[in-house]
């Protein structure tokens, strides 16, 4: 889920 940051945070 992309919450603000455009990184691989799933």
Curated annotation (Swiss-Prot):
Family designation: Belongs to the glycosyl hydrolase 13 family.
Keyword Cytoplasm among record annotations: no
Keywords, sorted A to Z: Carbohydrate metabolism, Glycosidase, Hydrolase, Polysaccharide degradation
More info: On the 2D-gel the determined pI of this protein is: 5.0, its MW is: 155 kDa.
UniProt protein name: Alpha-amylase
Record field: catalytic activity: Endohydrolysis of (1->4)-alpha-D-glucosidic linkages in polysaccharides containing three or more (1->4)-alpha-linked D-glucose units
Thermal activity characteristics from the UniProt entry: Optimum temperature is 60 degrees Celsius.
Gene Ontology biological process terms from the UniProt entry: polysaccharide catabolic process
Any one GO molecular-function label of the UniProt entry: alpha-amylase activity
Activity sensitivity to pH: Optimum pH is 5.0.
EC number of this enzyme: 3.2.1.1
């Amino acid at each position: 889920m992309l919450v603000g940051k455009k990184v691989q945070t799933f």
